[in-house]
């Protein structure tokens, strides 16, 4: 639903960067929040009563592969390399454009229901994901997943596909669909491929997303090939900078972490996928001590198996507490920022905060549920009690995408029925 102005009336608002809980109205004009205070006496095109709800910034999924919902449950209880080589890649080679379209559309519906407004996606047939993104109404950063395996002919194909997507998104000129460069990983992309990506990042002023230090196998492969760490390789090609969003970062050394911090790069932490594939535990304590910008991602639903950032926040917090045997090791404020403000910082968006002048990316959580009450600590309620279905309303760039738990942009039942026809599992 496109509105010139929206007034959220009487909600419990998580206001500002310090997350002060306040009873207030929120006025949205265009794509921005223009006023947050009690009793706003101004007309609006849409007035929503949120007096029994918690009003929070919507979430940013900093790393996913949305069409992989098609592969949910396909390969279970196996490590990453076996998971990829024996199960995922063989099936992905059979996926058609329409499979990617319907799979991503289902994924976007799932993300919307858990309060996600923005996501970073790496896959193929990205034009189909762009189409689904515009239809559902979320905001996407889409990159073609480049893999050349040191094959010069394959590299040329990957470069052409990337250039084609860049031109497609540029021509699309959408406020919701953005381009991002997406080399798969240092172990699947040659040095020349990574160097080309670095050059295009500067030429196109483009962000870059990549898998980094996800497994010990990756570290071993890169050290045998280059005699250094994957982070050093990215530094050598000119990719280690503030435009980089590196997923996982499990096996980073202390020196790697210092370099990432100095460069202003972002780590997209994916705790559920990391645990499910037995890949390891991200060194969050050291990353935060070194002021690394840490965002949150779900990874694909094939290795998670959901796209629920609320669940991801809970896992991110609990995992660190038990690994360090210290319940104070990470604060709820830090975890919540990873799902909101830190992701916005990585993408260069003025979002992730409910305050005047910020993008009107807002999720409304219905508090009329036993497992959410009482709200003694709003952040604790969100991180440890809430689940995806608790999000009642989603506003993306001032547009109401979901209201009363019903998507206004697409026929959800039709998408689910259609998905059953194209599922390859």
UniProtKB/Swiss-Prot annotation:
Record keyword Zinc present: yes
Binding annotation for substrate: 92, 184, 214, 299
Pfam families: Amidohydro_1 (PF01979)
Any GO MF annotation of the entry: S-adenosylhomocysteine deaminase activity
CDD domains according to UniProt: ATZ_TRZ_like (cd01298)
Cofactor binding note from Swiss-Prot or TrEMBL: Binds 1 zinc ion per subunit.
UniProt similarity note: Belongs to the metallo-dependent hydrolases superfamily. MTA/SAH deaminase family.
The protein's role, per its UniProt record: Catalyzes the deamination of 5-methylthioadenosine and S-adenosyl-L-homocysteine into 5-methylthioinosine and S-inosyl-L-homocysteine, respectively. Is also able to deaminate adenosine.
Reactions catalysed: S-adenosyl-L-homocysteine + H2O + H(+) = S-inosyl-L-homocysteine + NH4(+); S-methyl-5'-thioadenosine + H2O + H(+) = S-methyl-5'-thioinosine + NH4(+)
Cofactor(s) essential for the protein: Zn(2+)
Transmembrane segments annotated in the record for this chain: none
Known EC number: 3.5.4.28, 3.5.4.31
Signal peptide: none
Domain of life: Archaea
Residues noted as binding Zn(2+) in the record, renumbered to the chain: 63, 65, 211, 299
Keywords carried by this UniProt record: Hydrolase, Metal-binding, Zinc
Kinase listed as a keyword: no
Protein name: 5-methylthioadenosine/S-adenosylhomocysteine deaminase
UniProt source species: Pyrococcus abyssi (strain GE5 / Orsay)
